[in-house]
Amino acid sequence: MEAQRAFGFLFICVSIAVGSASTISEIAYLNGAALYYHAAIWVGSFGLVFGAATPIFRKVAPAIRGRMKASTKWPMGTKALNGVCWAGPFVAIAALPEFYQYLILLGIGLGNLSTYSLIKRYSGNDNREQLIVGALSLASLPVALAMDTSIFAMNPDIAVMLSRILIAVSYAAGGAHALIEVKRRRQSS
């Protein structure tokens, strides 16, 4: 239960950082800010969110490490498969940069789904928050494609921002599920 609470909090923090960085970065783009400002915005957003959350992360870090350590006991082929699911789409960005917003959604979706499936298989844990993030990220692919090719075809920057917002929503949904589930279990015991 502590690991689920820790990951719920982590996912909420990721959601806040991605959502705020996406919005601020779009505002900077619309105002003609230089490219290096975008990097500063993203690093700053994650730094502020995770910096503000440091006291809580100190308390929940052992639970996060514990869940992550479980994957070190997986067979080598399983670790490789999980790594490809996470890293493959991100590596593909170098070859297909015009599809990066879709590849990011694909990487987050496949990575979370593979990790969920493998943890369930090898540890017996049902980390549904990870399933939710993965499933929503993959379900966001056609939505992002529709936004990019029709609704916002004349404003591709907005389509990119909205695909990032979809990532934030996916993490928010997974994090909220985890925290609500922990609260429900505590109330029933």
Residue ranges and their predicted role:
Residues 1-9:
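N-terminal juxtamembrane cytosolic/stromal segments of multi-pass membrane proteins
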Residues 27-42, 91-105, 147-163:
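Membrane-helix interface and helix-disruption motif detector
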Residues 23-27, 52-56, 91-94, 110-121, ...:
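Structural signature of transmembrane alpha-helix termini at the membrane-water interface
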Residues 118-189:
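Terminal transmembrane helical module of multi-pass membrane proteins
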